[in-house]
Amino acid sequence: MITGFFGVPGCGKTTLATFFAQRELKRIKLFQSKFKRVYTNFSCSGCYRFDFRQLGVLDFSDALVIIDEITIDADNRAFKSFKQESVDFFIYHRHYNCDVLYFTQQWDAVDKKIRNLTQALYRIKKSYLFPFVTAKAIFRTCDINEYTSELVVGYRFPNFWEVFLALFHNKKVGKLRYCVFAPRLWKFFDSYSRPFTWAKWSPQIWS
């Protein structure tokens, strides 16, 4: 299953990604997980490190793959640089007992092929009750334009009946909301890590 999460900078995306990683690591240790490893492309205690370019090339079987800031490697405008090997990984991930969670600041900036394969989507927001991070499910709709007869994709939040069924853990509805206590996760990752090293320079002051 491929699940997408999006939210503005500083809303808690990496915190929530760490929550899923640490939760799965605990399940693996207790032999309660279908996975054997957890891979992340950001520094996260106990997880295996990987590079996006390795997807579809190296074996990621029986694993939970968590990708932070996916648009760095799979931007919708840079579709020509999106390799076929990576496409194959997302298409056949279930064949290898692999689930993918990805996080981004802009949902519509993610490569279209990945968006089309995304089965669940969540919007991340900072809770008014700091320091909690919340994520709310968003459902995609598909209608036919009566004038052009073309498919029109839209989005909506869960309706009353879906919220009601979720109370009984209905599998078809799925999880509608996540709420995590951020401080207990901060020790597992560095929110201010710098993935790039830029050249130093001396800016000039306007006269």
Language model regions located:
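Hydrophobic anchor at the beta1->P-loop junction of P-loop NTPases
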Residues: 5
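P-loop (Walker A) phosphate-binding loop of NTP-binding proteins
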Residues: 8
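Conserved lysine of the Walker
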Residues: 13-14
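Loop/turn-to-beta-strand initiation segments
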Residues: 35, 61-64, 96-102
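Walker B catalytic acidic pair
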Residues: 68-70
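Conserved P-loop NTPase motor module
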Residues: 120, 135-207
